[in-house]
């Protein structure tokens, strides 16, 4: 992608502490410290959609048995995840899979820039954890009614899916089970604020992801279970 070196979405950047309470950096330091005595099979990293998943029963049902770690921080964009990865969040562990779900908060960036940021994350994970597979979850539609951000997220997904074709250990999963109804609306039962998932909304997303994770883990153990069609 031309101009990617100047892409703000792919430049590792810490969050500016506008509120002045240091919470973002405190969470980052906690993630680094918590990982020192863990042996996770799977690590999740991303924004609030990752962070809030940890509070749902389905996390305990599906991902706790995989000794999964959750490094989600609300409000993060791609450049923030890159900074966290460059500053130790994967330093003390050797996961088999890293799940990345970020990009919907890159409001001021183009679809091409967001794609560059996600691709930079995949490249960095490959460098830091060459044994690990990377699963990138597609961005979800957002807003009760059709809007430009929803369309941009759709464009990002198309671009990311194509970009990841060049990375043999990276996989794209369309995380949307069909949240947009035939009239173009999204229900508050699935996304309570038309951005964040409800417990009901998390269920199909997590089950599809869990199915893919099990297949990837089995493949790496030589069992050869085929990948689902939604993953590439």
Curated annotation (Swiss-Prot):
**Reactions catalysed:** a 1-O-alkyl-2-acetyl-sn-glycero-3-phosphocholine + H2O = a 1-O-alkyl-sn-glycero-3-phosphocholine + acetate + H(+); 1-O-hexadecyl-2-acetyl-sn-glycero-3-phosphocholine + H2O = 1-O-hexadecyl-sn-glycero-3-phosphocholine + acetate + H(+); 1-O-hexadecyl-2-acetyl-sn-glycero-3-phosphate + H2O = 1-O-hexadecyl-sn-glycero-3-phosphate + acetate + H(+)
Species the sequence originates in: Mus musculus
EC number of this enzyme: 3.1.1.47
N-acetylserine modification sites are 2
State the protein's purpose.
Alpha1 catalytic subunit of the cytosolic type I platelet-activating factor (PAF) acetylhydrolase (PAF-AH (I)) heterotetrameric enzyme that catalyzes the hydrolyze of the acetyl group at the sn-2 position of PAF and its analogs and modulates the action of PAF. The activity and substrate specificity of PAF-AH (I) are affected by its subunit composition.
Q: Which GO terms describe its cellular component?
A: 1-alkyl-2-acetylglycerophosphocholine esterase complex; cytoplasm
Q: Which residues carry this modification: Phosphoserine?
A: 2
State the oligomer form and interacting partners: Forms a catalytic dimer which is either homodimer (alpha1/alpha1 homodimer) or heterodimer with PAFAH1B2 (alpha1/alpha2 heterodimer). Component of the cytosolic (PAF-AH (I)) heterotetrameric enzyme, which is composed of PAFAH1B1 (beta), PAFAH1B2 (alpha2) and PAFAH1B3 (alpha1) subunits. The catalytic activity of the enzyme resides in the alpha1 (PAFAH1B3) and alpha2 (PAFAH1B2) subunits, whereas the beta subunit (PAFAH1B1) has regulatory activity. Trimer formation is not essential for the catalytic activity. Interacts with VLDLR; this interaction may modulate the Reelin pathway.
**Protein known as:** Platelet-activating factor acetylhydrolase IB subunit alpha1
UniProt main location, coarse: cytoplasm
Spell out the catalytic residues: 48, 193, 196
Q: What else is known?
A: Originally the subunits of the type I platelet-activating factor (PAF) acetylhydrolase was named alpha (PAFAH1B1), beta (PAFAH1B2) and gamma (PAFAH1B3). Now these subunits have been renamed beta (PAFAH1B1), alpha2 (PAFAH1B2) and alpha1 (PAFAH1B3) respectively.
InterPro entries, per database record:
SGNH_hydro (IPR013830), SGNH_hydro_sf (IPR036514)
GO BP, one example?
A: lipid catabolic process
The compartments listed are:
Cytoplasm
Family to which this protein belongs: Belongs to the 'GDSL' lipolytic enzyme family. Platelet-activating factor acetylhydrolase IB beta/gamma subunits subfamily.
Q: Upon deletion of the gene, what happens? A: Knockout mice which are homozygous for the PAFAH1B2 gene appear developmentally normal, and are born at the expected Mendelian rate. Mice have normal fertility and normal spermatogenesis. Double mutant female mice which are homozygous for PAFAH1B2 and PAFAH1B3 are grossly normal and fertile, whereas double-mutant males are infertile. Double mutan mice manifest an earlier disturbance of spermatogenesis with an onset at preleptotene or leptotene stages of meiosis.
The lineage is: Eukaryota, Metazoa, Chordata, Craniata, Vertebrata
Give the start-end ranges of region Disordered.
1-20
Q: Name one Pfam family in it.
A: Lipase_GDSL_2
Q: Which UniProt keywords apply?
A: Acetylation, Cytoplasm, Hydrolase, Lipid degradation, Lipid metabolism, Phosphoprotein
Any one GO molecular function term: 1-alkyl-2-acetylglycerophosphocholine esterase activity
Record comment: activity regulation: Beta subunit (PAFAH1B1) inhibits the acetylhydrolase activity of the alpha1/alpha1 catalytic homodimer.
